[in-house]
């Protein structure tokens, strides 16, 4: 059976740079940072006191008060980004098509605030004070579950959990389900809210986070010699992915086509990437093979680019191994320099960003890149957005446990 073509017809975000797609995109193009001192708790005793928090979020936009009390924030973020994507797509559900439309939304960690809140209740007041909604409100697949319930989606209902690759993997697998005729459309993405005492403390304990507390907006600086770790972000992003002819029949706005999806595993270490960058390289090559295109077709890469000392130069090395001489003709940027690392939501948000780069023929910048590190000699679109012809974009996500994912997105040509 010939694979069906899959396109993106709806976008939605909740992010440190704004809770609408247009607000987030304009902030990115302006090179604004969403990193600020932590406000969710008193972080004065923590080595890291900064994060890229979501601000001015109102869960009542998408949930009633009763549902808000039953769910963790990561579910609420997912619900709002899914609402935006759904409304943007213009899809309508009826008894006939409901079994052909599904959901794939994951989270790297899940209900961290909900877990902390109920554990505190257990310690201070005993087991009877644990919420009856603790388990259903905290489990990762409840993001997909609540979205499917709200929109009566009776197709595939899954939540892939792969650390920092979660969002991209959910979108990639949703596209494959459509390509192989398991669904006609899916809401897919990722969500995260881990900027809590345990979340910040846990990442600080493995020395993954920046401690540039006196200059929050300059803390996330991918490929720069002065980088000292990533900045934790939070939020959610969803896209509606849909079979091409299905989208055309209802005159949907088609943003881009998903033409390639690659995966690989490092098989090296729990938290450190393979020092030869073989996993990263294999993943990118697999995505190009799946897309059936030459490396020279790619115009822009939205890189994983976390601002960690170990991973940044390895991703640059993998790009060179994948693209050869063309690597130096590519525009490559890390929008985590502005959004922070949104963990399970990162790959989903960066898919949205990649789509907008194609739509507007503009590569967002890598901010805070002042002194590129050794081996980091590609065109990283330093500090200012760039208008350029963009027809094909590659987006990378790599995660703890050596789990890697790459999407290739293209302008739709008929």
UniProtKB/Swiss-Prot annotation:
CDD domains found in the cross-reference section: KAS_I_II (cd00834)
Annotated GO MF terms: 3-oxoacyl-[acyl-carrier-protein] synthase activity
Location of the Ketosynthase family 3 (KS3) domain: 3-411
GO CC annotations on file: cytosol
Pathway stated in the Swiss-Prot or TrEMBL entry: Lipid metabolism; fatty acid biosynthesis
Gene Ontology terms describing biological process: fatty acid biosynthetic process
Catalytic site: 164 (for beta-ketoacyl synthase activity), 304 (for beta-ketoacyl synthase activity), 341 (for beta-ketoacyl synthase activity)
Domain of life: Bacteria
Pfam families, per database record: ketoacyl-synt, Ketoacyl-synt_C
Alphabetical keyword list: Acyltransferase, Fatty acid biosynthesis, Fatty acid metabolism, Lipid biosynthesis, Lipid metabolism, Transferase
EC numbers, comma separated: 2.3.1.179
Catalytic reaction(s) noted: a fatty acyl-[ACP] + malonyl-[ACP] + H(+) = a 3-oxoacyl-[ACP] + holo-[ACP] + CO2; (9Z)-hexadecenoyl-[ACP] + malonyl-[ACP] + H(+) = 3-oxo-(11Z)-octadecenoyl-[ACP] + holo-[ACP] + CO2
Gene3D superfamilies per the UniProt record, alphabetical: 3.40.47.10
Subunit and partners: Homodimer.
Function summary: Involved in the type II fatty acid elongation cycle. Catalyzes the elongation of a wide range of acyl-ACP by the addition of two carbons from malonyl-ACP to an acyl acceptor. Can efficiently catalyze the conversion of palmitoleoyl-ACP (cis-hexadec-9-enoyl-ACP) to cis-vaccenoyl-ACP (cis-octadec-11-enoyl-ACP), an essential step in the thermal regulation of fatty acid composition.
Family to which the UniProt record says this protein belongs: Belongs to the thiolase-like superfamily. Beta-ketoacyl-ACP synthases family.
Listed name of the protein: 3-oxoacyl-[acyl-carrier-protein] synthase 2
Lineage: Bacteria, Pseudomonadati, Pseudomonadota, Gammaproteobacteria, Legionellales
């Amino acid at each position: 059976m010939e694979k069906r073509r899959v396109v993106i017809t709806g976008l939605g975000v909740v992010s440190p740079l704004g809770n609408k797609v247009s607000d987030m995109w304009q902030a990115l193009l302006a090179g604004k940072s969403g990193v600020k001192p932590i406000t969710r708790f008193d972080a004065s005793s923590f080595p890291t006191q900064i994060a890229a928090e979501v601000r001015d979020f109102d869960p009542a936009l998408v949930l009633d008060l009763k549902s808000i009390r039953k769910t963790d924030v990561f579910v609420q973020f997912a619900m709002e980004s899914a609402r935006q994507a759904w409304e943007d797509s213009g899809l309508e559900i009826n008894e006939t098509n409901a079994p052909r439309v599904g959901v794939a939304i994951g989270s790297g960690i899940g209900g961290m605030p909900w877990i902390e809140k109920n554990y505190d209740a257990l310690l201070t007041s005993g087991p009877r004070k644990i919420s009856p909604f603790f388990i259903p409100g905290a489990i990762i697949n409840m993001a997909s579950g609540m979205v499917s319930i709200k929109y009566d989606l009776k197709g595939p209902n899954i939540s892939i959990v792969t650390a920092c690759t979660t969002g991209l993997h959910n979108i990639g697998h949703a596209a494959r389900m459509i390509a192989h005729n398991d669904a006609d459309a899916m809401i897919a993405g990722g969500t995260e809210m881990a900027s809590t005492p345990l979340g910040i403390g846990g990442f600080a304990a493995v020395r993954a986070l920046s401690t540039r507390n006196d200059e929050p907006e300059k803390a996330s600086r991918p490929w720069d010699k002065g980088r000292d770790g990533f900045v934790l972000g939070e939020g959610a992003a969803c896209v509606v992915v849909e079979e091409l002819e299905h989208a055309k029949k209802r005159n949907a706005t088609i943003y881009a086509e998903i033409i390639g999806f690659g995966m690989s595993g490092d098989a090296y270490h729990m938290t450190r990437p393979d020092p030869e960058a073989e996993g990263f390289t294999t993943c990118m090559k697999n995505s190009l093979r799946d897309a059936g295109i030459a490396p020279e077709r790619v115009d822009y890469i939205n890189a994983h680019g976390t601002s960690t000392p170990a991973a940044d130069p390895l991703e640059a090395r993998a790009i060179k191994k994948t693209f050869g001489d063309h690597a130096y003709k590519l525009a490559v940027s890390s929008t985590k320099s502005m959004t922070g690392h949104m963990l399970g939501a990162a790959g989903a948000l960066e898919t949205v960003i990649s789509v907008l780069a194609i739509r507007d023929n503009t590569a967002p910048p890598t901010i805070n890149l002042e002194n590129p590190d050794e081996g980091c000699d590609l065109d990283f679109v330093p500090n200012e957005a760039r208008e350029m012809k963009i027809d094909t974009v590659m987006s990378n996500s790599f995660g703890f446990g050596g789990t890697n994912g790459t999407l290739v997105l293209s302008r739709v040509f008929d």
